[in-house]
Amino acid sequence: MGTERSNVLKVSDLHVQVQTKDGASTLVQDISFELKKGKVLGLVGESGSGKTVTSMSILQLLDRKTTKIEGSITLQGRELNGLDDKEIREIRGKDIAFIMQNPMNSFTPVFTIGNQFIETIRSHTSLNKKQAKELAIDAMQNVNLPNPAKLLKSYPFQLSGGMLQRVMIAMAACLKPSVIIADEPTTALDVHNQLQVLRHLDKIRSEYGTSILLISHDLGVISEMADDVVVMQHGRIVEIANVFELFDNPQHEYTKKLLNARLSINLEEPIAHML
């Protein structure tokens, strides 16, 4: 019973198919894993392995007209798969938040940061505009953004990629969701901003007990951030292990290949020793 309570997010036998003109095509199959409270679960694999499809399925963001999602996805015991649009919108942003790889894609260019941030808060709370603005400013201060009141008046194109990503993290964390899904959150950033983003994610996890599903191809990031790791290949899970066990004693040949590829190109890891 205690294990069940500690599993904030549970995915069981997830199977996703997309309809094409040539018939049904399987994107992921037999996907099962659990994310515990206050833990970071790394989801790794090469491009096309099914990582993003898995995260989009959890968030119920795939096109339901062309995509069939089978299996169970529970968030704190509540089944997400099959919820209608209104029900899932109430959950997304409040109970489960999403940080995209490219922060510019997360914002509408014709509205200010403040307009989008404040409306996101108000759509999930009973706060008035002034209260929502105060919460937004507080959340932005927590991720060390300078002059939040001024930033709220800015448009997305006026901010750097690193600053936009920190705004996204502030938006994701401000309502203290039980789960944050971070899909390659550092890929588009320089080393300095990568470090800042990872530090803020770790701070959110430790302060709020937020669970994080961290999707990344960067094994250096995974080795420093994750408690457990899920390795995907061709739409399937090939290995699940504690992060230390995975790096010290990988079992599957594909996992060994990923680790060997990382070593063979002699990656510099400026982030790893600084977190």
Model-derived segments and their meaning:
Residues 4-7, 24, 146-152, 240-275:
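Short catalytic/signature loops enriched in Gly
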Residues 68-79:
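Conserved ABC transporter NBD signature motif
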Residues 174-178:
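A short, proline-enriched helix->beta-strand linker immediately N-terminal to the Walker B motif
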Residues 180-183:
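Catalytic Walker B motif of ABC-type/P-loop ATPase nucleotide-binding domains
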Residues 195-208:
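Helical segment within the ABC ATPase nucleotide-binding domain
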Residues 222-224:
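A short, surface-exposed alpha-helical micro-motif characterized by mixed small hydrophobic
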